Amino acid sequence: MDAWERNGVDYDVFGSSFYQFWQGNSSKNALAGLQKIENLAKSRGKMYAVMETSWLNSLKDADGTSNVIGEGHANAKVYSDDPQGQVDALTDMYQTLLSNDNGLGAFYWEGAWSPVKAGWTNWKYNKDMSDR
């Protein structure tokens, strides 16, 4: 950011990804990191937004391929691996994000954590599910 300022790069909002799962095995560690990034943006006079975030809803292998995150992974116990865990993770993130006067909000991402059937032939299944 120092180089951007030296070279006159202007931007409206400072944004970053925030995946609590990859921030350590404690929600406090993850949220402290989020607060530091937000404070960095504030020190530069910028608003801050989380550009992508999510939390898993299951550790089960739903598509027959190996998961990056699975049973026994220590960080998976920060929040529960179910829809309530998603609610809890997002609630904590938003409370931290909006506790500072420069937090704007977040974009939810990572559809791979929503189990679907794998493969190129699943278009009909996906279409049928989206029509419900």
Language-model regions, residue ranges each:
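Aromatic-rich peripheral "rim/lid" segments of glycoside hydrolase catalytic domains that contact
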Residues: 32, 36-39, 58-92, 96, ...
